[in-house]
Amino acid sequence: MVKIQISAGAHQGVRPKDIVGAIANECGVEGRRIGAINIEARSAFVEVPRESADRVLSGLNGRKICGVPVRLRVAR
């Protein structure tokens, strides 16, 4: 699994189901394949399968989650 950081969190109203929905709908990754999700105040972290990481990064960068444009990167 690869942990990805998303530039929106609880302050923007992001919930785990929003992240799962965005990844499943925009990137074609099945929800059951998505790992742990951690929502912080201004960012969120999600684990995705290593083979899907590039697809998630390119598929969601600049897209909106809960009406907020997001940036994604591999978390350190």
Q: What is each stretch, according to the model?
A:
Residues 1-76:
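Terminal-proximal interaction/regulatory segments of ATP-powered molecular machines
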